[in-house]
């Protein structure tokens, strides 16, 4: 009986240590979440302004004639590009599995062979997932900070836009978990290129005029590139916010489960201890009766 009590006591102690670890990780994730939410919200001010300027230009008189900018032209789709954003580690609940499942489902539905798409992987979990299935990402980024600056992701963003311009693929999507709140995220697949949701035909009668230097083509090239890059970066910040929220929720769940286990083990320990005491009393009474 003593051995059983010691075993239960040992389990309680180890579970308490686990609870302390997951509780600390929950607090760290909560701090990361607050910072990533603030960064994402701040960047949206800039991204919205870039979108507004781009929309105004595309709706203005400078778009009265056809444009040859490749970022606005829909080509016959022979190959698609997917930027897939995941985390670099586990302990994120269903954060990684949900987006990877959605991407694989889309690939299986829309493509007949690996020659019809390219994967650009942000995050080790996604990169390793695709490599394990014989799909080698054309470009990948690992070890991204919890609150990445634009400089940290500029290379992979610029490379993605460059590959589209060079016709390595004919359309580009970004696939990630959109942060709704601390408990909820939604899988989002957003078309980045070609730029279609800023069609100048949306606003007939728009009369804005612009004076552009050095010329229309140069301004469009720079602005559309900046728009695409800022949109992709915004998606990365959104995904990082969802990742931190998922990590916080997962650690909170683990902490709560550990506390439940501790409570169950404590009840089990008390019952075993009570049984041991009762047995000892019974043995003492029996011994005393035998001496009479």
Curated annotation (Swiss-Prot):
<dbReference type="Pfam" id="PF00231">
    <property type="entry name" value="ATP-synt"/>
</dbReference>
<comment type="similarity">
    <text>Belongs to the ATPase gamma chain family.</text>
</comment>
<protein>
    <recommendedName>
        <fullName>ATP synthase gamma chain</fullName>
    </recommendedName>
</protein>
<dbReference type="GO" id="GO:0042777">
    <property type="term" value="P:proton motive force-driven plasma membrane ATP synthesis"/>
</dbReference>
<keyword id="KW-0375">Hydrogen ion transport</keyword>
<dbReference type="GO" id="GO:0046933">
    <property type="term" value="F:proton-transporting ATP synthase activity, rotational mechanism"/>
</dbReference>
<keyword id="KW-0406">Ion transport</keyword>
<keyword id="KW-0813">Transport</keyword>
<comment type="function">
    <text>Produces ATP from ADP in the presence of a proton gradient across the membrane. The gamma chain is believed to be important in regulating ATPase activity and the flow of protons through the CF(0) complex.</text>
</comment>
<dbReference type="GO" id="GO:0005886">
    <property type="term" value="C:plasma membrane"/>
</dbReference>
<comment type="subunit">
    <text>F-type ATPases have 2 components, CF(1) - the catalytic core - and CF(0) - the membrane proton channel. CF(1) has five subunits: alpha(3), beta(3), gamma(1), delta(1), epsilon(1). CF(0) has three main subunits: a, b and c.</text>
</comment>
<keyword id="KW-0139">CF(1)</keyword>
<dbReference type="InterPro" id="IPR023632">
    <property type="entry name" value="ATP_synth_F1_gsu_CS"/>
</dbReference>
<keyword id="KW-0066">ATP synthesis</keyword>
<dbReference type="GO" id="GO:0045259">
    <property type="term" value="C:proton-transporting ATP synthase complex"/>
</dbReference>
<keyword id="KW-0472">Membrane</keyword>
<dbReference type="InterPro" id="IPR000131">
    <property type="entry name" value="ATP_synth_F1_gsu"/>
</dbReference>
<dbReference type="GO" id="GO:0005524">
    <property type="term" value="F:ATP binding"/>
</dbReference>
<keyword id="KW-1003">Cell membrane</keyword>
<dbReference type="InterPro" id="IPR035968">
    <property type="entry name" value="ATP_synth_F1_ATPase_gsu"/>
</dbReference>
């Amino acid at each position: 009986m003593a051995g059983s009590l010691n075993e239960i006591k040992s389990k309680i102690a180890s579970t308490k240590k686990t609870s302390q670890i997951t509780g600390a990780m929950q607090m760290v994730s909560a701090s990361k979440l607050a910072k990533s939410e603030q960064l994402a919200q701040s960047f949206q001010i800039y991204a919205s302004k870039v979108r507004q300027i781009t929309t105004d230009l595309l709706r203005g008189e400078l778009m009265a004639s056809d444009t040859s900018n490749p970022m606005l032209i829909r080509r016959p789709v022979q190959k698609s590009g997917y930027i897939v954003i995941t985390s670099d580690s586990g302990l994120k609940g269903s954060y990684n599995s949900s987006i990877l499942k959605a991407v694989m489902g889309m690939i299986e539905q829309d493509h007949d062979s690996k020659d019809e798409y390219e994967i650009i992987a942000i995050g080790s979990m996604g990169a390793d997932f695709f490599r394990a299935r014989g799909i080698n990402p054309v470009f990948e980024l690992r070890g991204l900070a919890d609150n990445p600056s634009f400089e940290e992701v500029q290379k992979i963003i610029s490379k993605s836009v460059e590959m589209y311009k060079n016709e390595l693929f004919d359309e580009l999507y970004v696939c990630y978990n959109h942060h709704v709140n601390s408990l909820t995220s939604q899988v989002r697949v957003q078309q980045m290129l070609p730029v279609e949701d800023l069609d100048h035909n949306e606003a007939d009668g728009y009369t804005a005029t612009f004076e552009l230097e050095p010329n229309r083509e140069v301004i469009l090239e720079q602005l559309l590139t900046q728009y695409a890059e800022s949109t992709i970066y915004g998606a990365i910040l959104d995904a990082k916010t969802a990742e931190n929220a998922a990590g916080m929720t997962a650690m909170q769940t683990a902490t709560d489960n550990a506390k439940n286990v501790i409570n169950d083990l404590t009840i089990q320990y008390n019952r075993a201890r009570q049984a041991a005491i009762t047995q000892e009393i019974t043995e003492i009474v029996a011994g005393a009766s035998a001496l009479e």
